[in-house]
Amino acid sequence: GGCIKWNHSCQTTTLKCCGKCVVCYCHTPWGTNCRCDRTRLFCTED
């Protein structure tokens, strides 16, 4: 269980980011420096 908090580092294969709309975003083309710091477009927290 558990989830990764906003702006904490993440890997797309492990725990999900906290919040339904929050996604793990990698800041380099080769898939490193990934953080839970993006939200899905047109997504609302329910």
Swiss-Prot record:
One of its GO terms (molecular function) is toxin activity. Disulfide bonds join 3-18, 10-24, 17-36, 21-43, 26-34. It is found in: Secreted. Expressed by the venom gland. Keywords: Disulfide bond, Ion channel impairing toxin, Knottin, Neurotoxin, Secreted, Toxin, Voltage-gated sodium channel impairing toxin. One of its GO terms (cellular component) is extracellular region. Its main location: secreted. The presence of a 'disulfide through disulfide knot' structurally defines this protein as a knottin. Shows very weak inhibition on rat Nav1.4/SCN4A sodium channels (23% at 50 uM of toxin and 35% at 100 uM). Competes for binding at site 3 of the insect voltage-gated sodium channel (Nav). Insecticidal neurotoxin. Causes temporary paralysis to lepidopteran larvae (10.3 nmol/g) or to crickets (doses from 0.93 to 119 ug/g). Is not toxic to mice when injected intracranially (high doses). Belongs to the neurotoxin 02 (plectoxin) family. 02 (plectoxin) subfamily. This is Mu-hexatoxin-Mg2a. The lineage of its organism: Eukaryota, Metazoa, Ecdysozoa, Arthropoda, Chelicerata.
